[in-house]
Amino acid sequence: MAKRWRKRAGRLAALVIAAGIYTFCIPAAAAEEATGGMANAVTLDIPARSCILVSGDTVLYEENADEPMPPASITKIMTLLLTFEALEAGQISLDQTVSCSDYAASMGGTQIWLEPGEEMALSDIIKATAVNSANDCAMVLAETVAGSEEAFVQKMNERAAELGMENTHFENPTGLDADGHVSTARDIAIMSVELLKHDGVTDYTTIWMDSLRNGETGLTNTNKLVRYYDGCTGLKTGTTDGAGSCLSASATRDGLDLVAVSMGSDTSAERFAACRTLLDYGFATYESFTPAVPPEQLTPVPVSGGRAESVAPAAAEAGPVIIPKGRGEAVELAVTLPEGLTAPVAAGEEIGEAVFTLDGETVCTLPLTAAEEVGEMDFAFALGRLWELFTRPPAFG
C-alpha cells in the first residue's frame, strides 16, 4: 500500500506543477526530497521531525515520512480501529458493560482513574479513549476485544501488516514509551484513513467536551483542532518523552477528506501548527473530483449473432479523485468502445473504458461493461423471431 501511495503522489504532484498554480520554479533538490522520488509542489515550514498529508491513499505532501519513531498515544488509533472492527463484526456492543482489571487500572500517564472492578458502558470507555486519551480505558478496550494485552498487541501488529504499515511495530495499546514501539507518519496516515471508514468513529473524535460518571468526570478533547479548525473530524494526539508531541488530524471541507500527521514536534502548540499548516495547504491546493460518464456518451454497441441487436455499456461508479483546485472543468474525457461485438456477451463483461485526463495526465480510468447479457442466437431463437415477424398484425397509418 505504501508503494501505491508514493506512485499516486508523484502523478498528482506533476499535475499541480503543470497546473501553474504556483508562479515559481521547483528546485531540483526539492523535487527529489521526499521518499520514493515524490515531488512536493511546495516546501512548507513544518515544525516537526516528520509529517505527511494524505487524502485517502493519495499523498499530497510529505517530509521524512518513513522514519520510525515513537508514536505515543497516536497508537490508540489502532486500538480504536480494532475496537470498531470488533463492533461491526458483532463481537462486542456499545451498550455492553465492561469491567476494569487491576492491570488496566495500573496504567500511568493520562487516565480517568478507573478503579479495579469498576464497571462502565463500552461506549463510555471508547469516548474516554478517543477524547481524553485515557490509558486505562485503552487497556480495557484491549482486554475486552482480545482477552489480554498480549493477544491484542498481536492483533495490532497483524492488522498493521495487512494495511501495509511497513515500518510499524506495536508493544502496547496505549502508546506509552516501550523499546521497539515505533511507527512512521506514513503508517499513521494509513491507519487513520482506515479508522475513518467506520461509521460512528467521528461521533467520538469530534467531541470537544463531555463527561462521564453522571457528570463527575469531565472530558476535554486533547485535540484542540476539534474546536478551532473548521471541518475538523478528529483524530488523535500523542505526547511522551520519547515521542515528543504528535498529532494525526483529520478534516473535511467541500467533499475533500484530508489527514495530516506530524511527529516529533517540540511542543504541543507546534504539533497543532504543523497539522494546521498541512491542512490549510491541502484545502487551498486540491479539490475532490468525482468522475462520471455522461449517458449520451454510453452509446449502444452493435452485437452480431446475438439475441439482441446491441448492448448498452455501463460505467462503473467511481469514488472521488484528487485534482488541483479549480481545475475540474479542465478534466477531459475519452470514451473507447468497440465498433461491434460478437455474441455471446456476458453481463458485466468489460467492453471499453472511459479515461479522464488533466493536462495530459490520467486521473482516472473507468471500465465500461455490458449492462446486460446478450446470448448467442441459435436456430430455435431465430425461428421464433421469424414467426413473430410473419404473424405480427400489419400497421396501418
What role is predicted for each listed range?
Residues 28-186, 190-199:
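Active-site-adjacent loops and short helices of periplasmic peptidoglycan-processing enzymes
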Residues 165-169, 177-397:
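Domain-terminus/edge residues, biased toward the C-terminal soluble/receptor-binding domains
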